[in-house]
Amino acid sequence: TWISSYDINPFDVSEAERIARLSELSERLLAADGVDHVDAHLVQVLENKYYADTAGTITTQQRVRVHPAFTAVNVDRGAGLFSSMRTLAPPAGRGWEYLVGTGWDWDAEIAELPGLLAEHAKAPSVEPGNYDLVIHPSNLWLTIHESIGHATELDRALGYEAAYAGTSFATLDLLGTLQYGSAVMNVTGDRTVEHGLATIGYDDEGVATQQFDIVRDGMFVGYQLNRQMAQANNLGGNGQGGRSNGCAFADSPGHIALQRMANVSLQPAPDGPSVDDLIGGVERGIFIKGDRSWSIDMQRFNFQFTGQQFHRIENGRLTGQVRDVAYQATTTEFWNSMETVGGPDTYLLGGAFNCGKGQPGQIAAVSHGCPAALFRGVNVLNTVAERGR
């Protein structure tokens, strides 16, 4: 028996109380100057799972997760334009306590958001070119998800999974030889981390979950595996060939268990710098916070990502926001440009509440932790200019 870490089952909270909390925070946003509309949503899941197999394994497990979010909108009626900004709070493997002060400071974020939105609405459009980027974990988690998480699913690398979001450039012949990123890059898969969306005691093949290396000192060293993929390719953790690392998941009894993503995370440097120190080391750059839209090719290689906030960095200082920013690179180019990773104080566990895979399609939730990080010489596009091409 295994139960995830939470304090208050959100389904024990009345609908009236849930609506009241969402309304309270929404009304604070609407009361601020420059906020013309607010969208609020809360998704909550209670998952009870019983598993038994012919080898004698029997497990009973329960997981709880929530995803609250608020989006503030500014409307410039004269120009016919609008700007929006969403809260940065990630989905989490927590209960109702997450909305009332445990794990996230909603009061602080709701108070700060209108000012950031007003600045964003009046910000100049970015001049495209090469910039040094300091990327906050509220943005970087998504880049990890798309360019590392999906790329290191072995079934995808072998071509078993192609119809839903493509295969992978990280093919089996590159294992142990591909310089995925710079020497400061260390990435793990981990289905045991507290409050992770993919965290559980046993996977859907009865395998105990664990932490394992995917990238070590920049070198590609491991895949995410289920039993079928591990056995067929003589791969596994701790030097033991043919052993799953606990990455099987089915979203319902009516679906076969697929190899699904663990909580794939970039590790901080134990004595790494703060966000302010990372910014202080940049002469001309952009500090990026929050995720928005993205695009990546069918091999998980060529991509572009946007964000919520883009703060100019000039001579080590933030000097106001710009807008219409997307950073573009190939996966290995981008991760090899990572010069510095922040320390544990910059670390945040972000994630995706609904990640799709397979045909028939299945949905899984997965977290991605990371520190803030500094990337040198990344190509930045102006999204408005690109749209006009």
Task: Describe the residue ranges of each PLM region.
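N-terminal small-residue-enriched
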Residues: 1-389
